[in-house]
């Protein structure tokens, strides 16, 4: 599998705090069958403002750590970019990275961002010649159970990503993210999802869940669909090919 949304670089955002935590995440991801991981540390004004130099420096250390985990584990560079207007200039001047230096950029919004703002932001990114991959579309209230809006964004030229944790079956009691799982299921049923990725941060609260999600998608939608969402489409993104 290929995971295009992950927080594996230590001490740069709300992901791993140490080299050891980074290594544990990589090892668990590899155990689940992931062989390529795009590191997408947060870039968010006012919240995650770690200098690019430090992110890049720690990323290179994580790439070395990956060699200790497995010789065939590939780590690529990227970013999860929270949209604010200044992002456009940074993307245009290549001050923040796309996914593995491709045409694709992983873009996120707040849960309560109005649809018109999402639409406007993505339009501006597309005008730069960059293709947005909308991170965890199940989070956004403006897209909830709204095939028309998601289809409109796809028709504009955007792609969509759902978190593997939200593909899992809801727990009977105390399920905090049940509504997101319902949204993810709706998007999958409507065939509005291009990629499933982990958005892993740590092994305690936010582990990969890739193997379990792959099995569930296979059971519900077939092996070909699972391969498309976990392998084929992510590979095209990493290799800068059209989906």
From Swiss-Prot:
GO biological process: capsule polysaccharide biosynthetic process
Keywords from the UniProt entry: Capsule biogenesis/degradation, Exopolysaccharide synthesis, Hydrolase, Manganese, Protein phosphatase
Transmembrane segment boundaries: none
Signal peptide: none
Coiled-coil region(s): none
Cofactor(s) the protein needs: Mn(2+)
Record's catalysed reaction(s): O-phospho-L-tyrosyl-[protein] + H2O = L-tyrosyl-[protein] + phosphate
Pathway per the UniProt entry: Capsule biogenesis; capsule polysaccharide biosynthesis
Domain of life according to the entry: Bacteria
Pfam families given in the database record: CpsB_CapC (PF19567)
GO molecular function: manganese ion binding; protein tyrosine phosphatase activity
Enzyme nomenclature, EC number: 3.1.3.48
Enzyme class: hydrolase
SUPFAM superfamilies per the UniProt record, alphabetical: Metallo-dependent hydrolases
Family: Belongs to the metallo-dependent hydrolases superfamily. CpsB/CapC family.
Role according to the record: Dephosphorylates CpsD. Involved in the regulation of capsular polysaccharide biosynthesis.
PANTHER family for the chain: TYROSINE-PROTEIN PHOSPHATASE YWQE
Entry protein name: Tyrosine-protein phosphatase CpsB
Species of the source: Streptococcus pneumoniae serotype 4 (strain ATCC BAA-334 / TIGR4)
The organism's taxonomic lineage, starting at the top: Bacteria, Bacillati, Bacillota, Bacilli, Lactobacillales
């Amino acid at each position: 599998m290929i995971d295009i949304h992950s927080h594996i670089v230590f001490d740069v955002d709300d992901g791993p705090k140490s080299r050891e935590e980074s290594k544990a995440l990589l090892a668990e991801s590899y155990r689940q069958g992931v062989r390529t991981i795009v590191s997408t540390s947060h870039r968010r004004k006012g919240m995650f403002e770690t200098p690019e130099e430090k992110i890049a420096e720690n990323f290179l250390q994580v790439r070395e750590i990956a060699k200790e985990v497995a010789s065939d584990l590939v780590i690529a560079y990227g970013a999860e970019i929270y949209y604010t207007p200044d992002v456009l200039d940074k993307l245009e001047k290549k001050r923040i990275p796309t996914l593995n230096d491709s045409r694709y950029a992983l873009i996120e919004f707040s849960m309560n961002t109005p649809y018109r703002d999402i639409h406007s932001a993505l339009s501006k990114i597309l005008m730069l010649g960059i293709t947005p991959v909308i991170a965890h579309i199940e989070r956004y209230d403006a897209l909830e159970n709204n095939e028309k809006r998601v289809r409109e964004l796809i028709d504009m030229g955007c792609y969509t990503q759902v978190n593997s944790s939200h593909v899992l079956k809801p727990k009977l009691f105390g399920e905090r993210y049940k509504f997101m799982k319902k949204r993810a299921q709706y998007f999958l049923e409507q065939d509005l999802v291009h990629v499933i990725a982990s958005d892993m941060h740590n092994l305690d609260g936010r582990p990969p869940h890739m193997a379990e999600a792959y099995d569930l998608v296979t059971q519900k939608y077939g092996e070909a669909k699972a391969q498309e969402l976990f392998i084929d489409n992510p590979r095209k993104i990493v290799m800068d090919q059209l989906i």
